[in-house]
Amino acid sequence: MADAVTTTTIQDGNRIAVVQLTNTSDGNGESAVTKIDVSALAPNSANGQVCTGVKLGRIVYSTFGMSVKLLWDATTDTICWDLNSDYTTDEDFTGFGGIQNTAGNGKTGDIKLTTTGHSSGDSYVIVLTLIKDYS
């Protein structure tokens, strides 16, 4: 059996993408699973440029029984944001342009997710507002 997970794109415009992630765990959890594939985001409608990366503009989340790590994908993944277990919050980073991707060698622009401390019945709901980059 596997965790019951969903990834739902709420908005995917020229500048902003909003994605909802959910998980109801069967106890297996997730390990470095790609949740945001920037190459799959909509291209810029004005010039056709493909999205090459994102900044984390805002995160709204609720976790029950497990913690979650969002990771910037690279040869050696780096932490984008830690989501505490049994916690609900709304963090807005748009006032300073968003959380930058700090990955080094092999940087893809994608965001991965890993759960820790998961047991059967634990869950998360995460809504990410992403600021798209076309460089």
Residue spans of the language-model regions?
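N-terminal low-complexity, intrinsically disordered "leader/linker" segments enriched in small/polar
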Residues: 1-60
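Noncatalytic modules at the cell exterior or secretory-pathway interfaces
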Residues: 97-124
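C-terminal interaction-tip segments
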Residues: 1-15, 115-135
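Short, surface-exposed beta-strand/strand-loop-strand elements in extracellular ectodomains
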Residues: 64-85
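Extended, low-complexity, turn-rich repeat/linker tracts enriched in Gly/Pro/Ser/Thr and Asp/Glu
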Residues: 60-69, 118-120
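Extracellular or exported targeting regions of proteins
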Residues: 51, 60-64, 80-82, 102
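An anionic, turn-rich surface loop/hairpin at beta-sheet edges
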Residues: 78-100
